[in-house]
Amino acid sequence: MLALGLVSCLSLGTTLSAQRTKATTAKRTPIQTITPKRPAGQRDVLGLRLAPMPVVRVGFIGLGMRGPSAVERFVHLEGVEIKALCDLHPDRVEKAAKILTKAGLPEAATYSGEETAWKALCDRPDIDLVYIATDWARHTEMMIYAMNKGKHVACEVPAATTLKEAWDVINTAERTQRHCMLLENCVYDFFELTTLNMAQHGLFGEVLSAKGGYVHNLEPFWKYYDANWRLEANIGFRGDIYATHGLGPACWVLNIHRGDRMDYLISMDVPATTLPRFMERQMGVKNPQVKNGEMTHTLIKTAKGKTIYLEHNVTSYRPYSRL
């Protein structure tokens, strides 16, 4: 169960205290989320193991910002065949295809030009793994469709944007028994893996609390996201909307899903300031309404009483940090 709420401040005036408490209690009732029962016949996939594949045949969907670099990495992997490339924009597909040519690899099938072109890629019988690097809004639909077609899935974060989507992804993975991997790259970075290794060898004793975050001024990058989808996400949604860079490594160190689980959280933010000014100055938007706070702080409590502290800030002029 997760609960989301704000900590009430102690009232200084005893006369007004009862009135304020009554008013704020109604506004700050924790959001309760219930874990649904697993449908009959489903098995969890936390320990899913399948027979080894001598060759993994891969199809890529989304070749804008992150997709091409994934293709570049995969051309160096033994036991991998890149079978198909897909993006809404044909020029991006052509550019990614040149990566294969430069590496001396066979041409891949290409799909582009239509909103549903990616489905044809997932329908192919010669693909084992679908790699998704599109905008956030499309992740869930693509993951579920691919798994229902018998494919394993690797998807850039986030895997879902609503609780319903999250459970739909989980239920599909469990029902189809397909690997469904969240491509949270920071858990594999040098510092994070070194720290995890030290923790697992007992150098820190018992780890009781972990801290992480995503502090990254995205102002130089907004223009590169197709149709401003990432900027729109930060305008329209409140809270830590990009938590996994800091949360993923913390979960590994605290053995989340390996003996412990996250129980509830408290989250609060400060008013948005830098992004509205940017929108006025650079985009000519008058009186922009931005829901995402300048800084969001989140404190998570686990079932065993441990804590995780997260920060999210993508607009302030400060150095990049995940600590």
What residues fall within each predicted segment?
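Conserved short alpha-helix immediately C-terminal to the canonical SAM/SAH-binding motif I
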Residues: 91-92, 138, 191
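Predominantly a Rossmann-like dinucleotide-binding segment in NAD(P)-dependent oxidoreductases
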Residues: 62, 175-181, 186-291
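N-terminal Rossmann-like dinucleotide-binding module
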Residues: 22-103, 250
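Bacterial N-terminal signal peptides
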Residues: 2-11
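NAD(P)-dinucleotide binding in Rossmann-like oxidoreductases
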Residues: 287-293, 300-323
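A structured beta-alpha segment of the ubiquitous adenosine-cofactor-binding alpha/beta core
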Residues: 107-132
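Boundary at the C-terminal end of the N-terminal hydrophobic targeting segment
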Residues: 13-18
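Beta-strand-loop-alpha-helix segment that lines the small-molecule cofactor/substrate pocket
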Residues: 129, 135-136, 140-188, 202
